[in-house]
Design a protein with these regions (language model features):
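Flexible "arm" and connector segments at domain edges
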Residues: 1-121
């Protein structure tokens, strides 16, 4: 992807999610496979992990600009993945809130996380 497209995408993301989605649609080839999206997500997470690892393990300065860039990339892949699966972004957020409310009624705590029972068979 060329710098012009990245700059345009950044500008549009700042305006609205609808406009951002339009640009994302243009940039995502119709035949893009879900595995490419998942690999992209994984790669971007790896870059964030590496940045934080270098900070914690080797005392390097935390590169917040890089982390912001990588989270932007994660957001792009997330939206592309949801679109490819026909999942609405707002529905995904709502379902996540329901899951967490069920898992941690009354709010999260370390103790509740250890004793959680929502995954028992």
């Amino acid at each position: 992807m060329c710098e012009k497209k990245y700059a345009e995408m950044i500008s549009i993301v700042q305006k609205s999610d609808e406009e951002w989605q339009r640009l994302s649609d243009e940039m995502t080839p119709e035949k893009m496979k879900l595995i490419q999206i998942i690999m992209g997500l994984s790669g971007e997470v790896g870059e964030i992990v590496d940045n934080i690892k270098n900070h914690i393990m080797y005392g390097k300065e935390l590169d917040l600009n890089n982390i912001i860039e990588e989270f932007g990339d994660l957001y792009w892949y997330l939206r592309a993945g949801l679109k490819s699966l026909g999942i609405n972004y707002e529905d995904m957020k709502e379902n996540n809130i329901k899951k967490l409310t069920k898992r941690y009624p009354g709010g999260y705590s370390r103790e509740k996380a250890i004793q959680r029972r929502d995954k028992e068979v």
